């Protein structure tokens, strides 16, 4: 299958979860034998107009992210590539519309990867780009609902989750045994207060906790742990790479999710795959609760006292280091769902 991915600004220009997700999908598809080309602004040095990396061809539409020039050149370049499917990042909306023109010239369906962190403006051009997409892919029901509220139809949307590496989960050694782990960038949406207040309720019990992540609010949270007199049992591990996180998760018994905003709770998923019991504090702007709806080793809570209660209750569950029920989220399984979606869209496009 020939797949054209369109992202004027790749993660080399602007590192966001949505861009990284689209690029990871491209990498997975290329590894599975598909012909994948990313049409983007040039991010590599030199004068070559394309670059090969991880089995993907990156083709420069423009030297820098210049919207007018990019939009003029993109449709013809897509038509010459003759893709079976075009997969686009939703911003800028003008680029998404240009991708639609190229897809139409190629007689290929246009799919839009709408992760939820793109900050798409609510204007006429963005609305046209949304309506022009044959399928809008979101990571969760929360984001799907937001897209529907902007005018997308139910048939026009699909939910495909973030993916994880179950082989890595199996291979990495478990870290030191701890009771509770939390992971999120320590910013204004982290809401570590709920966890710390819950832990403070258990001050008289023996427990240990690790907080993974760094950010502008780290000093504030460290001071709060000290004010609650639990800083001797809370370790702030800072930013950790994926392998380090997996090791910590495999040594932990409970993962507590309290962040105010999550398009998809990826760290919660990794932790549950590593055997952790999931405790999710419901937040209106977070999709985390969606991950635990059908799971036995998980609890949904609404306040710090309930967090404390469920941490205590979790002591009655056995410790695990791998949960094979999360295999449905493995990279290969999610990639197969993208392939199925592509094939369906190609088939539907061929009917008209």
Outline where the language-model segments fall:
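N-terminal subdomain of nucleotide-sugar transferases
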Residues: 1-45, 50, 343
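Donor nucleotide-sugar binding/catalytic pocket of nucleotide-sugar-dependent glycosyltransferases
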Residues: 117-119, 132-170
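Nucleotide-activated donor-binding/catalytic signature segment of Leloir-type glycosyltransferases, i.e.
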Residues: 222-240
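Short hydrophobic beta-strand element within catalytic cores of glycosyltransferases
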Residues: 277-282, 286
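A conserved, positively charged/aromatic
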Residues: 104, 110-138, 249
């Amino acid at each position: 299958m020939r797949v054209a991915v369109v992202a004027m600004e790749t993660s080399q220009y602007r590192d966001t979860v949505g861009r990284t997700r689209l690029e990871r999908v491209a990498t997975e598809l290329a590894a599975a034998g598909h012909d994948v080309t990313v049409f983007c602004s040039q991010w590599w040095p030199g004068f070559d107009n394309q670059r090969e990396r991880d089995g993907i061809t990156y083709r420069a539409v423009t030297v820098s992210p210049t919207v007018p020039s990019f939009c003029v050149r993109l449709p013809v370049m897509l038509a010459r590539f003759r893709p079976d499917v075009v997969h686009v990042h939703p911003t800028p909306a003008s680029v998404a519309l240009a991708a639609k023109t190229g897809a139409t010239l190629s007689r290929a369906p246009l799919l839009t990867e709408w992760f939820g962190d793109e900050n798409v403006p609510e204007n006429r051009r963005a609305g046209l780009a949304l309506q022009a997409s044959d399928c809008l892919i979101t990571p969760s029901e929360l984001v799907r609902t937001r897209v529907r509220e902007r005018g997308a139809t139910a048939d026009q949307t699909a939910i495909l989750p973030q993916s994880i590496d179950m082989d890595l989960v199996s291979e990495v050694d478990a870290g030191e045994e701890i009771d509770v782990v939390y992971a999120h960038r320590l910013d204004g949406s982290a809401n570590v207060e709920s966890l710390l207040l819950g832990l403070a309720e258990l001050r008289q019990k023996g427990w240990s906790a690790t907080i993974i992540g760094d950010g502008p609010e780290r000093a504030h949270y460290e001071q709060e742990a000290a004010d609650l007199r639990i800083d001797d049992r809370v370790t702030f591990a800072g930013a950790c790479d994926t392998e380090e996180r997996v090791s910590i998760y495999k040594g932990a018994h409970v993962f507590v999710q309290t962040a105010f905003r999550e398009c998809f709770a990826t760290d919660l998923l990794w932790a549950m795959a590593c055997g952790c019991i999931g405790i999710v504090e419901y937040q209106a702007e977070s999709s985390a609760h969606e991950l635990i709806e059908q799971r036995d080793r998980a609890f949904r809570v609404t306040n710090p006292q309930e967090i404390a209660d469920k941490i205590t209750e979790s002591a009655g569950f056995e410790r695990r280091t791998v949960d094979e029920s999360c295999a449905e989220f493995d990279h290969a399984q999610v990639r197969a769902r993208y392939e199925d979606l592509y094939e369906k869209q190609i088939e539907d496009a061929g009917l008209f």
